[in-house]
Amino acid sequence: VQVDVSRRYVIAHPGDVDAAITFLRDVQRSLGRVPFIRNLRVTGDTVRADLAVDVPFLGQQLLDFESRLEMHERGARLIATPREGRAWATVAGDGTVNPAPVGSMIEYALEISVFVALPASEKWGGKAFEKMAQATAEKAIERMTLEFPRGVAAAAQAERV
């Protein structure tokens, strides 16, 4: 089962453009409150974490991912590192800060891929199971991605304090 999701978000930041860029580039601060990102670690330009994903019929699984952090003039991007194995995730994103009438706006493009190997199925029952697992996984990841802007927005609003 492989599910690929791409989403775009616009998230308010209470600070000016420079403060929002600093926030965005600090992965611990900007992504630390996203509920499905666990065990977030940053070493140099390498970001590692676990993606908490509800896998059909297996429950919640922690799929590790690794991305490379790259700065650009108006923000930062995460470049996904290819993975292998029976279960994996990749996370990529590009955040750009723009001025707003009050504070700043972060435009974020998020791309997540999740892969979980299921036992090979050659009979019609197994094929039906695969289709059901694929549909269930797609719905679960859709729900999961709704948490992303909420988590980043909560972290951004905490900057007011």
Label the model's feature ranges.
Residues V1-D50, D54:
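Hydrophobic ligand-binding cavity/cleft-lining segments
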Residues D4-S6, Q61-E66, A87-D94:
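Short, surface-exposed coil-to-beta transition loops
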Residues V5-S6, P35-F36, D50-L51, R77-T81, ...:
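Short structured motifs
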Residues V10-D16, A52-P56, E70-H72, N98, ...:
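Solvent-exposed residues in well-ordered beta-strands and their adjoining turns
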Residues P14-V17, R41-D45, E70-G75, T96-E107:
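A short, structured loop/turn motif at beta-sheet edges
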Residues R38-R86, R143, E147:
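Glycine-rich portal/gate segments that line the openings of hydrophobic small-molecule binding cavities
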Residues R83-E138:
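Beta-strand/loop substructures that line and gate deep hydrophobic ligand-binding cavities in soluble
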Residues E142-V161:
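Short, highly charged C-terminal tails/helix-capping segments
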